[in-house]
A protein has these predicted regions:
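His/Asp/Glu-rich metal-coordinating catalytic cores
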Residues: 1-71, 76-287, 306-320, 339-341
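Solvent-exposed loop and beta-edge segments used for protein-protein assembly and interaction
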Residues: 15, 144, 289, 459-461, ...
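Conserved hydrophobic residues forming the short capping helix/wall of the S-adenosyl-L-methionine
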Residues: 108, 403, 534
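Broad gene-expression machinery/nucleic-acid interaction feature
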Residues: 132, 147-149, 464-466, 544-546
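Flexible glycine-/small-residue-rich
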Residues: 139, 154, 297-299, 469-473, ...
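Hard-cation-handling environments
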Residues: 201-330, 334-359, 363-515, 523, ...
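C-terminal tails and terminal domains of large nucleic-acid-associated
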Residues: 515-551
């Protein structure tokens, strides 16, 4: 049978975040695979106790003997965040540029995994030979250091996987987009381009970090009191802008938040941020007058445990905020975070603190391509096939329309699990791989249907009842049950307790407890009775636990 070239997204197609993409080449049954990116997304309030969500890698785990490498485009969490959680199931080589390598080493260190013999550091614009794939890293621009597109060469043709990108003429830190090489790649012929869809609805160009710096300097020059800047820690160009503006306005700067320190250290380790003023410890910054300090902190999305939220609640041990200070949100609002972020901003304004954000000043540009950026990339690459990824369904469908406007002969719409045959023949979805999500519950990966998640949702919505019942040797109830309940809206506690005790006694009297099976039957009946009683009295059907104790 003839060799074939396949593409299969397991995450990031039909959603923003959690990127995981597979490429395969070879005869059916003899494919060799590479994985591009292995990211996470973050849970919302509908999943209490869950922090991270990542793609279910089961499809490729079953083929791990033929997985010859994980190739990482850049260091954002939605592209590398799952690597330390999922790699132990895959145990293959990893390829990344220096900055990304530093950050993933930290992730494995936290898991006590020695990745040294598997991690391959690729220099910027370097080449990786993973037969039958020859992968060339192409420097792009984005909202993080060292973003890369991948030119993936196979005997069947060339694929350009863009990763996350935009066209920034003045990125301030790191290299400019390698437009000359991209044009050469396009002129040599590209079978398919796998492309970022995030900002397909945004007109014009994405904008430059240099323009943000000019605006930030103008804003900060007019402020007289304490300044707190909240930004994504991973945006090192924005970090450098904060340092630059602090120095130009005669202020010192202090980093607040674990992620800020981690990214600053990694950037320094890779040779960046060498010419900025030295940050001072927040404990030292307390002794500096309000007019002479800038704090750069985490928490731009209103995260409950991040530095900015603690500062706003006056619970941070080192950073104090007061009336007439200013908080600058140099970031966009990630969809889903609006409520908690606006609550934070309202609290700040209520306390007499000025809030500056992209809603009222120019303090942020996106790291993803607007339509003019996309147009330019399509003109450079001229792909025969376009496959939109990194977007919700509405983004990807609009991107398909855009690709048609750019005269791409074969745009292909995909969702997670779709297997696209790029060669031979016209590119199209021809099969489906199993795909899904895994949830990090504590230190354990679970599926959404897991009992722990179901129980926690139930507890969160309906509360909890526990009844402990003493059973005599003759099988009857000894005294009244011991009751505990939480999260149930009870007006008259005494009335509720007495009523619940009566319901338990009524059920228990009807049972003879001579065997384990009879005990199990009683427990089931008591659970039903307790939930029914609570539903009638409070409208809640709580999670219920029954303990039978023989005396």
């Amino acid at each position: 049978m003839k060799e074939e070239l396949l593409f299969c997204p397991l995450g990031g197609s039909g959603e923003i975040g959690m990127n995981m993409n597979l490429f395969a080449y070879g005869k059916p049954g003899e494919h060799k695979w590479i994985m591009v990116d292995i990211g996470v997304t973050f849970a919302d309030d509908t999943l209490p106790g869950i922090d991270l969500i990542y793609p279910d890698p089961g499809f490729i785990v079953d083929k791990k003997e033929d997985l010859i490498g994980i190739v990482l485009t850049h260091a954002h969490e939605d592209h590398i965040g799952a690597i330390a959680h999922l790699w132990p199931q895959l145990k293959c080589k990893i390829f990344a540029t220096p900055f990304t390598s530093v950050l993933i080493k930290e992730k494995f260190k936290e898991k006590h995994i020695d990745i040294t013999s598997y991690l391959n550091v690729v220099q910027l614009n370097g080449i990786v030979d993973l037969d039958p794939f020859k992968i060339e890293y192409i420097t792009l621009t984005h909202s993080i250091l060292e973003p890369n597109g991948l030119r993936i060469e196979t005997p069947a043709g060339v694929i350009l996987h863009t990763g996350d990108w935009k066209i920034d003429p003045d990125p301030l830190i790191g290299g400019k987009i390698n437009s000359n090489r991209l044009k050469e790649i396009g002129n040599d012929g590209v079978l398919a381009m796998i492309c970022d869809s995030t900002n397909v609805f945004s007109m014009g160009k994405a904008g430059s970090e240099l323009d943000v710096r000019k605006s930030m300097l103008n804003i900060m020059s007019s402020l007289k009191k304490r300044i707190i800047i909240a930004s994504f820690a991973s945006n090192v160009a924005r970090l450098e802008t904060a340092f630059y503006c602090a120095e130009k306005t005669g202020r010192q700067i202090s980093l607040v938040g674990r992620s800020m320190h981690r990214i600053f250290k990694a950037a320094r380790q890779c040779g960046y941020l060498k010419n900025v003023i030295e940050p001072i410890d927040p404990r030292e910054a307390k002794n500096i007058s309000r007019e002479k300090i800038v704090y750069l902190c985490t928490g731009s999305q209103g995260e409950p445990m991040a530095a900015l939220m603690r500062i706003a609640k006056y619970t941070h041990p080192d950073v104090f905020i007061e009336k007439d200070d200013t908080v600058i949100f140099s970031s966009k609002i990630i969809p889903g975070n609006e409520k908690k972020l606006y609550n934070l901003q309202n609290q700040l304004v209520k306390d007499g603190i000025e809030v500056i954000s992209e809603e009222n000043e120019f303090v942020h540009v996106s790291g993803h391509p607007n339509r003019e950026d996309l147009k330019e990339m399509y003109e450079w690459i001229k792909p025969q096939c376009a496959i939109p990824v990194h977007g919700e369904h509405r983004h990807m469908i609009e991107h398909i329309k855009f690709a048609k406007e750019m005269n791409v002969p074969n745009p292909v719409q995909v969702e997670n699990g779709d297997i696209v045959k790029l060669y031979p023949g016209t590119p199209k979805v021809y099969d489906k791989a199993p795909s899904g999500r895994l949830y990090l519950d504590g230190n354990v990966s679970v599926v959404e249907e897991s009992q722990s998640i179901k129980d926690r949702k139930n507890l969160s919505a309906n509360g909890y009842i526990e009844a402990t019942i003493m059973i005599t040797p003759k099988g009857s109830m000894h005294k009244r049950p011991v009751l505990t309940f939480r999260g149930i809206p009870v007006d008259d506690v005494e009335e509720f307790v007495y009523g619940l005790e009566d319901a338990i006694e009524d059920i228990t009297r009807t049972f003879k407890l001579g065997s384990k099976q009879q005990e199990h039957n009683l427990i089931d009946a008591l659970k039903i009775a307790c939930r029914k009683f609570s539903k009638e009295k409070t409208g809640k059907k709580p999670f219920t636990n029954i303990n039978l104790v023989r005396i």
